[in-house]
């Protein structure tokens, strides 16, 4: 094969690959600007399962918290989201400290605690009611967020109940929702490295 033709083919492949990546980046930002998409994110790395006995939501020292690696992951995800073209976002967090820390480290303008994102790991019987509350919150927020991204930082159990997807720490689910806040379809977005 002529080396010049081979180089041209490689160059065209590289251009196509870059264009594909840029299109995907713009696609995420564009979807999150619409009223029918929301990004659910599992908090970043907090080693262990559940919380210690006798934990309280008002005292982070009693909870399972982000590790140093988890804090770095949250900061990196915030950078990645901005590199995808997401410059404005309404960020909401579960009341658990590992979620609040993840939300803060994303470094969007501000974030707020939202009770419907609270974990029901300690009492799985709460799953249906909690999911209905989350759907109601999503339905309300997608109507009022304008073109800002809606980012919800929560827990594995909440995302599994909402989307039926097992996800790792820092993974995200881009959910298309209907007017009632119910998921129509979703795309798993693994934690960027």
Task: Report residues per predicted region.
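Generic beta-sheet signal
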Residues: 36-38, 146-154
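N-terminal signal peptide c-region/cleavage motif recognized by signal peptidases
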Residues: 18-23
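Short, surface-exposed amphipathic charged segments that create phosphate/polyanion-binding patches used
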Residues: 125-133
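Bacterial N-terminal signal peptides that target proteins for export
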Residues: 2-11
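Active-site-proximal alpha-helix that buttresses catalytic centers in soluble enzyme cores
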Residues: 26-115, 120-124, 165-193
């Amino acid at each position: 094969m002529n080396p010049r033709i081979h180089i041209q083919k490689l160059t065209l492949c590289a251009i196509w690959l870059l264009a594909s990546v840029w299109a995907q980046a713009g696609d995420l930002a564009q979807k999150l600007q619409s009223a029918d998409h929301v990004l659910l994110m599992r908090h970043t790395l907090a080693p262990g399962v559940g919380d210690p006995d006798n934990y309280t939501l008002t005292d982070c020292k009693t909870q399972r918290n982000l590790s140093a690696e988890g804090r770095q992951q949250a900061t990196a995800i915030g950078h990645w989201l901005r590199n995808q073209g997401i410059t404005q976002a309404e960020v909401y967090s579960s009341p658990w400290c590992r979620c609040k820390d993840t939300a803060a480290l994303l470094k969007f303008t501000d974030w707020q605690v939202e009770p419907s994102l609270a974990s029901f790991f300690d009492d799985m019987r709460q799953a249906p009611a909690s999911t209905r509350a989350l759907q109601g919150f999503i339905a309300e927020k997608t109507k009022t967020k304008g073109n800002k991204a809606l980012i919800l930082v929560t827990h594995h159990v909440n995302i599994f109940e909402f989307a039926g997807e097992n996800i790792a720490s820092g993974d995200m689910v881009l959910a298309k929702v209907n007017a009632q806040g119910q998921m129509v379809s979703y795309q798993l977005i693994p934690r960027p490295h």
